[in-house]
Design a protein with these regions (language model features):
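N-terminal, active-site-proximal structural segment of metallo-dependent hydrolase catalytic domains
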Residues: 1-79, 91-95, 239, 248-249
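Structured beta-strand-rich core segments of catalytic domains in phosphoester-bond hydrolases
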Residues: 3-10, 60-132, 138, 220-227, ...
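Metal-dependent phosphoester-hydrolase catalytic domains
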Residues: 1-7, 112, 144, 158-169, ...
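Active-site beta-strand/loop signature of hydrolases that rely on acidic residues for catalysis
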Residues: 18-24, 44-69, 133-136, 152-183, ...
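N-terminal post-signal-peptidase region of extra-cytosolic proteins
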Residues: 36-44, 86, 199, 228-231
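Residues that flank catalytic or metal-binding motifs in active/ligand-binding sites
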Residues: 15-20, 96-98, 120-122, 129, ...
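Surface-exposed cleft-lining segments at the edges of enzyme active sites
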Residues: 27-33, 111-114, 137-146
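Active-site beta-strand termini and strand-to-loop segments that position acidic
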Residues: 12, 102-105, 125-130, 212-213, ...
Length: 249
């Protein structure tokens, strides 16, 4: 059926929760030649603020490196008014590199777990009142590592949240346009099929929001999109596009 919210812009809907994911590319814009002090935190923060998520998973964040001698997630938190929760994945250029979450309300607890990769990877779980939100950035080189990453997260949920009945969401850059079939036995994609990695000769969808189906949660997707805004050209802010999902509260 047609989505009744299509064509209405991306304003927040009444009685809804907005989840999002965004690979920030170190806030450096869309080009691939990284370097020092190229970051534009105002641009990245503007996209996040226009999206107005309740919680957003962010990938590729420097913290006090030689490239960016600041806490990039804190820079975004300062500009958006959201709460930052950082998850270091590797030591990098004299500092840290990793993923994070920005949220409007503080989570009850957080947990960081290890995932496989030629470059070390993590999943970062945050429990809120109405749901669990897991941010991640999977290995970019190996289908096997990505499949194992799904297994590790699923096993962690089964071991630690067996009695949990609320929705559990997974959001991030999964670095593949084809998710492992085995993973889709426990997870359902609820985000848009639009391409998210586009400044390339072969655009693809590699950024997702999924819901865990193992606990048969009650949820209702109202809308999902790769948003665009008149106020800023999202194509130039990162080499990825942001993804949002609106759910009934």
């Amino acid at each position: 059926p047609d989505n009744p919210y299509d064509g209405q812009g991306y304003d927040r809907l009444p009685n809804s929760v907005r989840l999002a994911t965004y690979n920030t590319h170190r806030c450096e814009g869309w080009t691939q030649n990284s370097g020092t002090d190229r970051a534009n935190y105002n641009n990245t923060a503007k996209v996040i603020s226009l999206m107005d998520p309740d919680v957003i998973a962010l990938q590729e964040l420097d913290k006090n490196t030689t490239w960016h001698q600041t806490d990039q997630l804190q820079e975004l938190a300062d500009r958006t008014g959201m709460r930052p929760y950082y998850c270091k994945t590797i030591s990098y250029r004299g500092g840290d590199y990793g993923i994070g979450i920005l949220c409007k309300t503080a989570p009850k607890n957080t947990y960081a777990g290890d995932l496989p990769g030629t470059e070390a990877r993590k999943f970062f779980l945050a429990e809120f009142d109405g749901y669990i939100f897991i941010a991640t950035h999977f290995c970019h080189q190996s289908d096997e590592n990505r499949q194992r990453s799904f297994e590790i997260i699923t096993e962690y949920i089964a071991a630690n949240y067996a009695a949990y009945t609320k929705p559990i969401y997974l959001a991030g850059d999964l670095n593949t346009s084809k998710l492992p079939a085995a993973a889709l036995e426990s997870w359902k994609i609820i985000s848009t099929s639009a391409n998210t990695f586009v400044n390339t000769s072969s655009p693809s969808r590699i950024d997702y929001v999924l819901v865990y189906t193992g606990n048969s949660p009650s949820y209702e997707v109202l809308r999902t999109a790769v948003p665009s805004y008149e106020e800023i050209n999202v194509m130039t802010v990162s080499d990825h596009l942001p993804v949002l999902v609106d759910l009934k509260k």
